[in-house]
Amino acid sequence: MNDFTLNAQARTDLGKGASRRLRHAANIPAVVYGGNKPAESVTILSKEIAKLFENEAAYSHVIELNVDGTKQNVIVKAMQRHPSKQFIMHADFVRVVAGQKLTAIVPVHFVGEDAPVKKGGVVSHTATELEVTCLPKDLPEFIEVDLSAAEIGTIIHLSDLKAPKGVEFVALAHNDDKAVANVHAPRVVAEDEEGETAAE
């Protein structure tokens, strides 16, 4: 299991103007809340948080956040990126309390896609991440979806997945058995449509 750490500094200069000044200085604003403690506004070096989240696993791991020498365990709850440049503009972190269940977003990893593709199928991913609830010690790095037995017409729902021990899918708790992936036949263009296109 990887260890993830991040350094931050407390900030008191708040508001949109302050956030813009932070970004111009190569920092980003962030908020830490939860754990029955007051919310904290902090600032983090842009390059440091960018480097951390180059590793996909950081999104679903407990992170040791060091705020001016005070360490606390957190998970990322939300992240705002620039719409076109994709750099991180703001982050929300939730404190993790040992023995207390947390809710987190975990990436989905698809395996065995070659099997249905070799049979002429086209695989569509309808979910690339899933919301789970579990104790901090049980937080998975990812959820695996095995497509090796899938055929054309197969739809894999959340209820078809085997959750890791101690992990529950939030959507299922709300009776939302959503599709995660499906295999369908390739789209065939009618000959007359092809002819019309060629004529144009």
From Swiss-Prot:
Keyword Repeat: no
Gene: rplY
Record's function text: This is one of the proteins that binds to the 5S RNA in the ribosome where it forms part of the central protuberance.
Xref: Pfam families: Ribosomal_L25p, Ribosomal_TL5_C
SUPFAM superfamilies: Ribosomal protein L25-like
GO molecular function, one term: 5S rRNA binding
GO cellular component, one term: cytosolic large ribosomal subunit
CDD domains attached to this UniProt entry: Ribosomal_L25_TL5_CTC (cd00495)
A GO BP annotation: translation
Description of how the protein assembles with itself and partners: Part of the 50S ribosomal subunit; part of the 5S rRNA/L5/L18/L25 subcomplex. Contacts the 5S rRNA. Binds to the 5S rRNA independently of L5 and L18.
Stated family: Belongs to the bacterial ribosomal protein bL25 family. CTC subfamily.
Name of this chain's protein: Large ribosomal subunit protein bL25
Superkingdom of the organism of origin: Bacteria
Alphabetic keyword roster: Ribonucleoprotein, Ribosomal protein, RNA-binding, rRNA-binding
Organism encoding this protein: Pseudomonas fluorescens (strain SBW25)
